[in-house]
Amino acid sequence: MDRKEMNKIIFQNTEYMCKTDSALSDATKKSVSGQRFIAGSEKLPGLNLNIYKNKARIVVSRKRTYEAAAYYKGQHVAVHNFASAVNPGGGVVYGAGAQEECLCRCSNLYFCLNTPDMWGMFYMPHRAAHDPIHNDDIIYTPDIV
């Protein structure tokens, strides 16, 4: 079996689990309820950037995204999804293997992104723009599992 087929099977298993496991289903509903679209043109409130005693450290490692995030278990961790602006999960349903697809293959992220609200506010406008550069729009999705 090639990698693409294996990726599709893994995603199908994730989909099955997210639909049939009540804890995962509840977690997905909770994440979707807290999910927020932030337009690139939206003005963000002033931020107090001096709230931590120690300065941020930037660490470059060979770890995969969720592997690196797991190191900070129990803390509030944000993961940057280098995402497709036109397809939720990129090509995860077809077995593609870039970063977004990997995130969606092993979590409930795809099922949070693939909602009517996000299609209307994020994916369809980007498709209609026909601009490969897209813009600075953001989807914030809390508490992915």
Q: Predicted regions: what is each one?
A:
Residues 1-145:
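Macrodomain-like recognition of ADP-ribose-binding/processing modules
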